[in-house]
Amino acid sequence: LQKITGFIWTYAITNPGVNALRTPVYAEMVNIVNDKPVEFSKYKFDADTIRSMFDNFSFNNARPITKAMIAWWAYQNDKQPLLSLETTFEIEHIYARNRNEKENSLTDARNVESLGNKALLEKRINIRASDYRFTDKKKYYEGFTNSKGQVKEGTGVVELLDLTATSADFTENDIIDRYKKMIDCFINYLQKNSLIK
């Protein structure tokens, strides 16, 4: 399952379109039926090409691969417990889009839509936290009790909780560094699943 998932996600970026996936995936499904190993031996990826393709890919929120990648990333943290399937998750911009529009503080405005700036966040929290600076978002990520004594539960996404505990702000450099860690980790994942040449 990990090998097929890694292959499909990578192939969807390097060779977009459902039709492009049919040939390699069908051959491996035949191998499964015939009780042979799934190897994708004719379709191994080059790590540098993957990195370049990911760097040039637009991970916009309308693409299912965006949410899939950030969900995968959340579970690369060994401390991340399983999140409830009943919870609705949205894509959180850690460095708020609205903040960039108001402050014009990113040297490259495209970084606001970088995979390194996105995380899963429960919809009930994202509605309240979406337009704030990171220092203000921390309260919503961690949870709090409001002036009426109502407890507002925080996120179950461990990475966001770790960020609130260790970072005073989330800057453009943090976006770039986090993106690099994500891609390095994904390429390592492909390597572990024998999908790299």
Question: Where is each model-derived feature located?
Answer:
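Active-site-proximal structural scaffolding
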Residues: 1, 22, 43, 62-63, ...
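Histidine-centered nuclease catalytic patch
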Residues: 82-114
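Extended alpha-helical interface modules used as scaffolds for assembling large macromolecular complexes
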Residues: 21-25, 29, 93, 156-160
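Intrinsically disordered or highly flexible coil/loop and linker segments, enriched in small
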Residues: 1, 10-21, 38, 79, ...
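Generic, well-ordered alpha-helical scaffold segments in large soluble proteins
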Residues: 3, 7-11, 28, 32, ...
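Long, cytosolic, alpha-helical-rich C-terminal regions that act as interaction/scaffolding modules
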Residues: 56, 111-114, 118-197
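Short cysteine-rich loop/turn motifs with clustered Cys
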Residues: 64-90
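A cross-family structural signal marking well-folded subdomains
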Residues: 1-65
